[in-house]
Amino acid sequence: MDEASNAFEYIRTLELQHQKKKPTFSDLMDYLDIKARKEGIPLYGQFELTPLCNFDCKMCYTHLTREQMGDRELLSTEQWKKIIHDAWNAGMMSANLTGGECLTYPGFEEIYLYLRELGCEIVVLSNGALMDEKWIAFFQKHRPRMIQITLYGGDEETYYRVTGHRHFDKVIRHIKMAIEAKLPVAIAITPNKYMDEGIFQTIKLAKELGIYYNISGILTDPKEETGRSGQDHNLPVDGHVQILVYRNQLEGIETIPIPPEKLPPPGGPYHEWQGCGLTCKAGQSCFTVEWDGKLYACGSIREIWAEPVRIGFENAWNHVRQEALKYPVVPECIDCPYESVCTNCAAIKTQYAGKGRRPLLLCKQTQFLVQQGVMRIPDCR
């Protein structure tokens, strides 16, 4: 789509192209994101209020215990409010509150209400175990943009294998309470090897709940300090195929495999440096501030960070943005025939092959998913 001169033109173009009867707030944010990336405005912020959690998921990239935190302390509520205010002054319009489990942070309510006072849209990322009557009433009174609850299984045994706790019944009860309260709630599913066959019951349950659900792909490697890094928590690629075929069956979508000889080889025409810069929102229009006050372009790219508590938000954001613009692009990914379905995540590509290097195994896995008919690329049927 050619760049529109203003938001109204952008929305009209969407209506013409997709016959949308009622443009959404997300459509407006998409337009603002285009502008924000160009101008270097931090439109989206993610705030990891705490690394502490009431779950102990085997594949979690961030959860720490009190012992692992050592003598480090959580930021105070006032410190968070200062960072948030400065981010809002710099252009932030949307904030994700996460953890760990963000509802365990003592100042959650105050921070949440402060974001509301500033006029930011808020997404709450939670495991749902604490989302009881008290929190349901709170969010009814002060509605978020979305509450995203991660579902780790379809029964107590799967929950125990993944999270170390049998909280399945409690989480499902809380999700149903949120739905009954007409709160905007969505389900996230994170496939991993610990779910085993329980993944299919999890997807079926998410479908039966009748709300939006999303199935994520490749897991990013946990932070080294968690003690879970360097381990393979992912499903094999054929496991992802089975999951997506099952999802298609539930959604009434036909899965049509494609003969290998009809598929183009992965990789674009370039094999030498073509430029730099993260190709996602990270460091362009979004940022993450973690529990210890460090600001990252992306929490999965650990070498790009700054300290807004020490140098101020504006200086921290500008530093992170400049470093993000230097991040090497994989030349073979440019104009690759699988570009529209392959991950756009630089952290995952780096996880496969190192910075700026072609992730050959990821290329083969993406081609395999297209061959199996669970992903589709243009002009290939």
Where are these regions (language model features)?
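Radical SAM enzyme [4Fe-4S]-AdoMet core and its adjacent flexible, acidic
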Residues: 2-11, 142-146, 150-296, 300-305
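Short glycine-enriched, charge-decorated loop/helix-capping segments at active-site entrances
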Residues: 66-74, 161-167, 351-352
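Short Gly/Pro-enriched turn/cap motifs at secondary-structure boundaries
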Residues: 37, 275-280, 324-327
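Conserved alpha-helical substructure of the radical SAM core
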Residues: 2-146
